[in-house]
From Swiss-Prot:
It is found in: Secreted; Cell surface. SMART domains: LysM. One of its GO terms (biological process) is division septum assembly. InterPro entries: CHAP_dom, LysM_dom, LysM_dom_sf, Papain-like_cys_pep_sf. This is N-acetylmuramoyl-L-alanine amidase sle1. The gene is sle1. Residues 28-71, 88-131, 152-195 form the LysM domain. It is an enzyme of class 3 (hydrolase). It catalyses: Hydrolyzes the link between N-acetylmuramoyl residues and L-amino acid residues in certain cell-wall glycopeptides. Residues 205-329 form the Peptidase C51 domain. Coiled coil: none annotated. Residues 1-26 form the signal peptide.
Length: 329
C-alpha cells in the first residue's frame, strides 16, 4: 500500500515537472491580441518595452493581432547586415506596414523599400513585395535624356513607383511629376500617368499661400488607440512619415481641440500628410490625406469608415465636400 502511494507521488511529481516545463516553454512567446500594446505585453511578462523590441527586432511600437512575439530569451537580431541571397516575396494584407513586414522577416523597412523600388511608405493589400535578396543593379539604371515628342500614358500597377516607371520609359521621375502635375510621390494602382511629351504651362494649379516654415510638434508615444479604428490608423500613418501625434486625443471628434492645445496648426487647407477631421457622427472621424488632386478633391486612407475595423480603405473626397473637414498639420 505504501509503495503504491509512493509511486503515485513520484509519478505526480514527474507530471507536475513536465507541466511546469511546458508552461515555461510556452511563456517564451506571446500572440498579440486586439487592443494590446508593447507596453501592456511587457508589463504582463515583467520586462521592459526596449527588451521586448530588442527580442523581436522591432524598429517601431507597431504590432498587430495574431503577431507572435518573443517575450524571453536572447535576441537573434544583433547582426542583420546580411539578408541572404535567396529571393522571397510577401503578399501585403490589410493592416500591414513596411515596419511590421520587415520585423516578421528579420530585415529593415529600408531594405524592403530598396528591394521594391519604393519611394514612399504606402503599400496596398494584395501587393507583392520582395522581402529578401539583393537589390538588382538594373533597378537603378541610368535614364535617357530624350523624353520623346509623342504623348504616351501608363496605367499604374501594384508595386510601381515613379522611379521604376521612369526607368522603364527612359526618363526621370521629376519629368513624370511635371507631366502630371504631381507634388508628391504618391501613386495608386489604376492611375493613368503621362510618361512622355511636354508639360503644359497650366499643369500646376495656383494654391493658397501657406507657411513654408511651419513645423508641427512630434510625439513618440506608443499607440493606445483602439486597434483598427480610424484614430489607430491615422496615428500609425503619421508615425510612419515621422510626424508622430499624441496618443491622448481620445475620440476623433475631440482631435481638433486636443491638437490645437498641443500646438498643431488647424485650418481648412488639406496637404499631403495632414489629418482630415470631422465631428460628424457620435465619435467623429479622422482620415490621413494621401494626395491632394488638382481639381480640389483629396484622396484619403482610413479605417472603420466603409469597412470593418482593421480594414484599410481609400476614398476620394470631392472638392465640394472638403470644406466639411478641418485639417490638422
Amino acid at each position: 500500500m505504501n509503495k503504491k502511494i509512493l509511486a503515485t507521488a513520484v509519478l505526480g511529481t514527474g507530471a507536475l515537472s513536465t507541466l511546469f516545463a511546458h508552461q515555461a516553454e510556452a511563456s517564451t512567446t506571446h500572440t498579440v491580441r486586439s487592443g494590446e500594446s508593447l507596453w501592456s505585453i511587457s508589463h504582463h511578462y515583467g520586462i521592459t518595452v526596449s527588451k521586448l523590441k530588442s527580442l523581436n527586432g522591432l524598429s517601431s511600437n507597431l504590432i498587430f493581432p495574431n503577431q507572435v512575439l518573443k517575450v524571453s530569451g536572447s535576441s537573434n537580431y544583433s547582426s542583420r547586415s546580411n539578408y541572404g541571397n535567396s529571393s522571397s516575396t510577401y503578399t501585403v494584407r490589410a493592416g500591414d506596414s513596411l515596419s511590421s513586414i520587415a520585423s516578421r522577416y528579420g530585415t529593415t523597412y529600408r531594405h524592403i523599400m530598396n528591394l521594391n523600388g519604393l519611394n514612399s511608405f504606402l503599400i496596398f493589400p494584395g501587393q507583392q513585395l520582395k522581402v529578401s535578396g539583393s537589390v538588382s543593379s538594373n533597378s537603378h539604371s541610368s535614364y535617357n535624356s530624350n523624353s520623346g515628342g509623342s504623348s504616351s500614358t501608363y496605367t499604374v500597377r501594384y508595386g510601381d513607383s515613379l522611379s521604376s516607371i521612369a526607368s522603364r520609359y527612359g526618363t526621370t521621375y521629376q519629368h513624370i511629376m511635371r507631366l502630371n502635375g504631381l507634388n508628391n510621390f504618391f501613386i495608386y494602382p489604376g492611375q493613368k500617368l503621362r510618361v512622355s511629351g511636354s508639360a503644359s504651362s497650366n499643369t500646376y494649379s495656383t494654391r493658397s499661400a501657406q507657411s513654408t516654415y511651419y513645423s508641427s510638434p512630434v510625439f513618440n508615444h506608443r499607440n493606445l488607440y483602439d486597434w483598427g479604428q480610424c484614430t489607430w490608423h491615422v496615428f500609425n500613418r503619421r508615425a510612419a512619415i515621422g510626424k508622430g501625434i499624441s496618443t491622448y486625443w481620445w475620440n476623433a471628434n475631440n482631435w481638433d481641440n486636443a491638437a490645437a492645445r498641443d500646438g498643431y496648426r488647424i485650418d481648412g487647407n488639406p496637404t499631403v500628410g495632414s489629418i482630415a477631421q470631422s465631428d460628424a457622427g457620435y465619435y467623429g472621424h479622422v482620415a490621413f490625406v494621401e494626395r491632394v488632386n488638382s481639381n480640389g478633391s483629396i484622396l484619403v486612407s482610413e479605417m472603420n469608415f466603409s469597412a470593418s475595423p482593421g480594414i484599410l480603405t481609400y476614398r476620394t473626397i470631392p472638392a465640394y465636400q472638403v470644406r466639411n473637414y478641418k485639417f490638422i498639420h
